[in-house]
Amino acid sequence: MSEPNVRRHLDVDLHPTVCNLCGGEVEYIENYKVYGQSYGSGWMYRCKKCDARVGTHKPHPTEALGILSDSYMQKAKKMCHEAIDELWKGQRNEKKARTAVYADLAERLGLDFESCHIGYFDLELLRSAYRAIMDMREERGLTRKPEGVCSIKRNED
């Protein structure tokens, strides 16, 4: 029997060489080669086989922002961020509010706080996170958004 206060830790490779989705080779490239212009740090990791990708941190451009994501995961991450950001942005102390919101989400998902980054979530965890965020919004008097992420399915799902 597991201890109730033990939280799951997500082991994320922030310098990927193998794709977490298809096992293909990952390259570290300047992102203008994909997007036509440079964004953020100017760098990204991209799978040569399935084209999954992830951006990198601006101050640490070799460090990935999370796991490689296909178009389904990219859409789900965007929807989760849009929904959760409304819970803390514009608050008097945004940093404290953001920390509290993500601590709440981590608890609901059974994750340790350090693992609670939307960029670290696979599609299954993104679906769970979206449901939890909708509950959090409702509890705070904000409207629920459509079940968007929960309905995102890959062809093989």
Labelled PLM ranges:
Residues 131-157:
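Long C-terminal interaction/binding lobes of large macromolecular proteins
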Residues 90, 108, 136-139:
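Surface-exposed polar/charged interaction patches
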Residues 5, 9, 40, 66, ...:
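Short, charged/polar micro-motifs that form catalytic or ligand-binding hotspots
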Residues 1-61:
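N-terminal cysteine/histidine-rich coordination modules
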Residues 60-95, 99:
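Extended interfacial segments that mediate partner engagement and assembly in macromolecular machines
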